[in-house]
Design a protein with these regions (language model features):
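Short, conserved beta-strand element in jelly-roll/cupin
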Residues: 119-137, 183, 215-218
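Short catalytic/ligand-binding loop motif for oxyanion handling, primarily in non-cytosolic enzymes
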Residues: 27-28, 138, 153, 199-201, ...
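Short, structured patches in soluble enzyme cores that scaffold and shape functional sites
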Residues: 95, 114-116, 130-134, 146
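Double-stranded beta-helix
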Residues: 135-199
Length: 271
């Protein structure tokens, strides 16, 4: 299957959607795991309030076989290899998100922000999220402000941009700027430049949004060791353990890895 990467769109607007990056059957399998093993009420509307608003819509799952089957899919790696111009990459051990339709009393989505200091040229990375179900533009998915990305060379530090408690950099003054809400089909990958201000949007549809965060990039020794330790012990990487449910008492069984998966984890060296 041919996968199209709109690199010019990524360069101009700071994001791109890659259709069919992951087989739909792998997405369906992970959704099934969320429902049957993680007790996520995918089809039970009476319990959607349990995941109403951040951070309750983040699901503490990071080492399941169904996640690794997506991470180590060759097509997904090829996409990131094109972006980084090298095969020698590591993969993030991120989790899933289940965002039900918003109701009064639910928490608000995160504000538009950067996850990395946008003035630090050495911190530029590509970030990614896989849609596990069809996600309309009003369904709580990825949103961004391309005009701020396009004007990045004119940015300066000012009171309009602060850090929040999670050490994200907030884009406060965005009045009058277009906010783009990105729709996706199951299996699509949305990739964005870390210099693009973004967040999740409010789900004002009638169905949940389900997604899985997957990012690949060059991996230093500290990250490699943390990834391998997480896989071996079944515990999440240290920087997630302060989140609700992430320091679980019953750790994951180490997932079965392909040769590609072992290299992405950092267990084996790249040739």
């Amino acid at each position: 299957m041919t996968i199209h990467l709109d690199i010019p769109h990524l360069g101009r607007f700071g994001w791109m959607r890659i259709a069919g990056a992951v087989p739909v059957k792998l997405c369906e399998r992970l959704v099934e795991v969320l429902e049957t093993e993680m007790d996520v009420p995918v089809h039970d509307q009476s319990r959607w309030h349990e995941h109403g608003g951040e951070p309750r819509d983040l699901i503490p799952i990071w080492g399941h076989q169904a996640q690794w089957d997506i991470r180590q899919h060759p097509d997904l790696h090829r996409i990131w290899a094109v972006l980084w111009k090298t095969d020698r990459l590591g993969v993030s051990l991120d989790s899933c998100r289940f965002t039900p339709p918003w109701k009064p009393g639910f928490g608000e989505p995160n504000r538009i922000h950067w996850d990395y200091d946008p003035w630090n040229a050495e911190m530029r990375v590509f970030q990614g999220v896989v849609a596990l179900n069809e996600t309309a533009a009003n369904q709580g998915g990825f949103r961004c402000v391309p005009s701020l990305y396009q004007e990045r060379d004119a940015w300066w530090r000012s009171p309009s941009l602060d850090q929040d408690g999670a050490k994200n950099w907030l884009a406060k003054n965005i009045e009058g700027r277009e906010i783009v809400n990105v729709a996706a089909q199951a299996g699509d990958l949305i990739v964005w430049d870390s210099r693009l201000p973004h967040s999740n949007s409010k789900n004002i549809s009638s169905v949940p949004r389900i997604a899985f965060y997957v990012t690949m990039g060059p991996m230093d020794e500290a990250l490699r060791q943390a990834n391998v330790e997480s896989w071996r012990t079944g515990r999440c990487v240290p920087w997630w353990r302060n989140r609700r449910g992430y320091d679980r008492t019953e750790p994951w069984t180490p997932a079965a890895l392909t040769q590609l998966g072992r290299r992405l984890l950092g267990l084996d060296d790249w040739p």
